[in-house]
Amino acid sequence: MFILNFNKMKNVKLLLMLGTAALLAACSNEADSLTTSIDAPVTASIDLQSVSYTDLATQLNDVSDFGKMIILKDNGFNRQVHVSMDKRTKIQLDNENVRLFNGRDKDSTSFILGDEFAVLRFYRNGESISYIAYKEAQMMNEIAEFYAAPFKKTRAINEKEAFECIYDSRTRSAGKDIVSVKINIDKAKKILNLPECDYINDYIKTPQVPHGITESQTRAVPSEPKTVYVICLRENGSTIYPNEVSAQMQDAANSVYAVHGLKRYVNFHFVLYTTEYSCPSGDAKEGLEGFTASLKSNPKAEGYDDQIYFLIRWGTWDNKILGMSWFNSYNVNTASDFEASGMSTTQLMYPGVMAHELGHILGAEHTDNSKDLMYATFTGYLSHLSEKNMDIIAKNLGWEAADGD
């Protein structure tokens, strides 16, 4: 006799339902996993206690179009940074191509990667920190000695807070290899008692409003991204380190991209060459006038007067002047007769000088906001905050600032 066992059937149905649910859940999890693997950036970590050129290059070369999550670790310090490649900015240092990478605004972190060097920069507790690494050991040792030399004279007990050599963790011998250096710029300036520099009288007004910025010269939305060429000429006899000049270039480009959303419409292309010109004295005004005259008389520069030029040196000029430029001298629609030019120091301890002088070239005036890039005294802040300045920069780059940008 066949007797239906309802309890047993209920159990079978329950098992079937559970099995189906498990299968659906598995499919759902697989789909979620697939979506995550496609959309989520890869996560990696960098140990700052032993960071080298190879470490930075390996991680940065692997940054995809989706970006990449990199965790910076240092003895209890952990920062997760979403890193994206800056595809708008091109840098050529002689024969070396350099790529830039930025974190999100809240990350306050940026990277620079060249064929022979790499730089990591970030802010921590309001202080600017840089890690600098070179690929070749000889050059790495030279850079380490260059930055260490001023501290040897101070004998400061807190020197390590400002400057530190990073050694290869795999080397166990007494003579460990230096793979990078760490510099806390804010602490270093205090220990070394570096002078406070200002930007007062750091620009020259042209005889007339250069190439009159008129409504007819602007357009609401550019038809395509405009490439702005910035030609940086190494002053004759001046030593320029690629990690320093590329950082100045990165700050200059980022300062403009942040203005009214210009990063959608502007590309910067920086190149570095050497010039035979050198300033005849320490007078910055005289130096800039001579530099502009040398460009006008150089047959190789003929036909390139629509570009921006910088004379760069490692040092400063008389009266602690960090740079000098022709004010409001560039408009994207007209040639400038080489007056869209300036001078800038490349010193690591004074970030953003090229960005400040570029601001003047694009028409930005000094402000009374100490957190503004265009503040008259050097503070190290890297962003334009004045609406008036940002509007004139946008006009000089060829269009009106759109509402809501």
Curated annotation (Swiss-Prot):
<keyword id="KW-0482">Metalloprotease</keyword>
<keyword id="KW-0862">Zinc</keyword>
<dbReference type="InterPro" id="IPR024079">
    <property type="entry name" value="MetalloPept_cat_dom_sf"/>
</dbReference>
<dbReference type="GO" id="GO:0008270">
    <property type="term" value="F:zinc ion binding"/>
</dbReference>
<dbReference type="InterPro" id="IPR006026">
    <property type="entry name" value="Peptidase_Metallo"/>
</dbReference>
<keyword id="KW-0378">Hydrolase</keyword>
<feature type="binding site">
    <location>
        <position position="366"/>
    </location>
    <ligand>
        <name>Zn(2+)</name>
    </ligand>
</feature>
<dbReference type="Pfam" id="PF16376">
    <property type="entry name" value="fragilysinNterm"/>
</dbReference>
<keyword id="KW-0843">Virulence</keyword>
<feature type="binding site">
    <location>
        <position position="356"/>
    </location>
    <ligand>
        <name>Zn(2+)</name>
    </ligand>
</feature>
<feature type="signal peptide">
    <location>
        <begin position="1"/>
        <end position="25"/>
    </location>
</feature>
<dbReference type="GO" id="GO:0090729">
    <property type="term" value="F:toxin activity"/>
</dbReference>
<keyword id="KW-0479">Metal-binding</keyword>
<dbReference type="InterPro" id="IPR032273">
    <property type="entry name" value="Fragilysin_N"/>
</dbReference>
<feature type="binding site">
    <location>
        <position position="360"/>
    </location>
    <ligand>
        <name>Zn(2+)</name>
    </ligand>
</feature>
<dbReference type="GO" id="GO:0008237">
    <property type="term" value="F:metallopeptidase activity"/>
</dbReference>
<keyword id="KW-0800">Toxin</keyword>
<dbReference type="GO" id="GO:0005576">
    <property type="term" value="C:extracellular region"/>
</dbReference>
<dbReference type="GO" id="GO:0006508">
    <property type="term" value="P:proteolysis"/>
</dbReference>
<keyword id="KW-0964">Secreted</keyword>
<keyword id="KW-0732">Signal</keyword>
<protein>
    <recommendedName>
        <fullName>Fragilysin</fullName>
        <ecNumber>3.4.24.74</ecNumber>
    </recommendedName>
</protein>
<comment type="function">
    <text>Diarrheal toxin that hydrolyzes gelatin, azocoll, actin, tropomyosin, and fibrinogen.</text>
</comment>
<dbReference type="GO" id="GO:0141139">
    <property type="term" value="P:symbiont-mediated disruption of host mucosa"/>
</dbReference>
<dbReference type="InterPro" id="IPR038176">
    <property type="entry name" value="Fragilysin_N_sf"/>
</dbReference>
<keyword id="KW-0645">Protease</keyword>
<comment type="similarity">
    <text>Belongs to the peptidase M10C family.</text>
</comment>
<dbReference type="InterPro" id="IPR001843">
    <property type="entry name" value="Fragilysin"/>
</dbReference>
<dbReference type="Pfam" id="PF13688">
    <property type="entry name" value="Reprolysin_5"/>
</dbReference>
<feature type="active site">
    <location>
        <position position="357"/>
    </location>
</feature>
